[in-house]
Amino acid sequence: GPFAFKLWVENTKLVLRKNPIYYKQDQNGIQLPYLEAVAISFLPDKQSEFLEFSQGNLDFISGIDQSYKDALLTAQGELHPDYNKRVYLLKSPFLNTEYVGFSLQEDRPEIQSELIRKAINYGVDRKKMITYLRNGIGLPADKGFIPKGLKGSGERVIYPYDVTEAKRLVDSFKLLHPEISPKLTLSTNAQYLDLCEYMQTQLDQIGLDLAIDVLPPSTLRQLKNTGGLELFRASWVADYPDAENYLSLFISQNFTPNGPNYTHFQSREIDSLYLEAMRVQKDSLRWELYKLMDQKIMQHAPIIPLYYDMAVRFVSKKVIDLGINPQNFLFLERTRKR
């Protein structure tokens, strides 16, 4: 690769040095990479990261956080004028879907009922969520789990924001279970508390009581893998740019802890369509199968897709040709620094 390991100080810093025998050259015959070294800092939280960046100690930061988004971004998702002279903004569609999942191994009627699961999908205004909580960064995830930009992603809105329909579904559940006042607990970490509180307010309007349990990230991951949660906030970033990567979360052979099916959703039809898609040689036919699978999965509503994310980088103007890509990989081979 273009860089080689030089130094690692645990929880503090990782240093990579230019590889003197790297095989690539630019169009002028100059050996790549241009940079002599890369230093990666390990910081305790996003606020510390932002402060280091503001003080000029970091050359770029990636992603947005509630603690600093309003300082760096306008309400329309553009770079704040205060930073125009020394920072530039890079944005790209990101192969990441943020969602809330149901643990379907839980036997509580509220979890098992498609009425409640669909009601929540109808009852969350994703557009407002993007506007007010994300400063316009991202797209409402209302067309399925596969993010926009991947072949096989949906074209039709499956769950538009519809309070009337959401209330009707909740009322239908209450008629079937008059002894139950539906209540659910959503587990998250502190970074996404604002998003979960937004959902809590929205669902209160349709007659659902949503409690929020804030857990350390490590505990949340462990319980998500073992099925110890009712609802959980999660994200799925593609390992490779193919929609199969997203659909694998709903295949019965991938139940956690042996695979990424955190919801324990199970459908013979989906399993069969998945195997068929893996056998198909023609890309266009496989993409149509992906689209069909996504639609059928969402009809059962094992998850609530919230938004399709965007990759965002705030970069010092001292840095040239950093670039950005849909998987948010960091390619520094041709990057320079003034």
Task: Label the model's feature ranges.
Residues A71-L90, G227-L229, D242-G259, S316-I320:
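Ligand-binding "clamshell"
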Residues A39-L51, I64-S67, A190, D213-Q222:
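Short helix-initiation/N-cap motifs at beta->coil->alpha
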Residues L115-K118, I130-L133, D209-R221, N225, ...:
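Extracytoplasmic/peripheral linker and loop segments enriched in polar/acidic and small residues
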Residues P2-A4, L139-F173, Y192-D194:
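Structural transition elements
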Residues R313-R338:
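Long beta-strand-rich cores associated with HINT superfamily self-processing modules
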Residues G1-S48, L72-N96, T164:
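Aromatic-rich, solvent-exposed beta-strand/loop patch
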Residues E10-T12, G138-L139, S172-D239, A311:
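Ligand/substrate-recognition segments at binding pockets and active sites
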Residues G1-P2, L32-A37, Q55, K85-V87, ...:
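Alpha-helical secondary-structure segments
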